[in-house]
Amino acid sequence: MPDLVAYTDGACSGNPGPGGWGALMRAKDGDTILKERELKGGEADTTNNRMELLAAISALEALDRPSTLTIITDSAYVKNGITGWMHGWKRNGWKTSTRKPVKNVDLWQRLDEAQSRHTVTWEWIKGHAGHEGNEKADELARAGMAPFKTGKRGKDG
């Protein structure tokens, strides 16, 4: 069975401001890429963290059956949230340890639901450090943001 990897990234011009997300999905056999799919989208008024979350959500929601995959993100916010903080948030009724509402709770809950159908390994890598898959996800995120920087609207995947 091939390895499934998703590189995800978000981008924002201003924070908040126009933003985009990108995901590069790859089925691989060792170093050989068997299949590749590019996803992207954006919003007119958003934050970088929301775009990072939407990139991961979109990668998971694009899968048409339960899968085992690795999601590679340059967002410590997403990686730490899904692998650590979320357990406490759920236990506390989606409140932080200081009893404040979790920011972006709508997307965290959607990510939790999307992940529940799959077996996911989460990896963090340094952004803008020459990782080919991450650089491509960044390009997709910027392309997803582009229509919103000029006032146009669009999404494809």
UniProtKB/Swiss-Prot annotation:
Enzyme class: hydrolase
Gene3D superfamilies in the record: Ribonuclease H-like superfamily/Ribonuclease H
Residues where Mg(2+) 2 binds: 9, 138
RNase H type-1 domain location: 1-146
Co-factor(s): Mg(2+)
GO CC terms of this entry: cytoplasm
Biological process (GO), any one: DNA replication, removal of RNA primer
Catalytic activity as recorded in UniProt: Endonucleolytic cleavage to 5'-phosphomonoester
Free-text comment on the cofactor: Binds 1 Mg(2+) ion per subunit. May bind a second metal ion at a regulatory site, or after substrate binding.
Family annotation (InterPro entries): RNase_H (IPR050092), RNaseH-like_sf (IPR012337), RNaseH_domain (IPR002156), RNaseH_sf (IPR036397), RNaseHI (IPR022892)
Main location: cytoplasm
Binding site for Mg(2+) 1: 9, 52, 74
EC number(s) on file: 3.1.26.4
Matches recorded under PROSITE patterns: RNASE_H_1
Pfam family, one: RNase_H
UniProt-recorded Gene Ontology molecular function terms: magnesium ion binding; nucleic acid binding; RNA-DNA hybrid ribonuclease activity
Protein keywords: Cytoplasm, Endonuclease, Hydrolase, Magnesium, Metal-binding, Nuclease
Compartment annotation: Cytoplasm
Top-level lineage group: Bacteria
NCBIfam families: PRK00203.1
Family indicated by similarity: Belongs to the RNase H family.
Subunit annotation: Monomer.
Known role: Endonuclease that specifically degrades the RNA of RNA-DNA hybrids.
Protein name: Ribonuclease H
Species whose genome carries this gene: Jannaschia sp. (strain CCS1)
Lineage summary: Bacteria, Pseudomonadati, Pseudomonadota, Alphaproteobacteria, Rhodobacterales
Gene name for this UniProt entry: rnhA
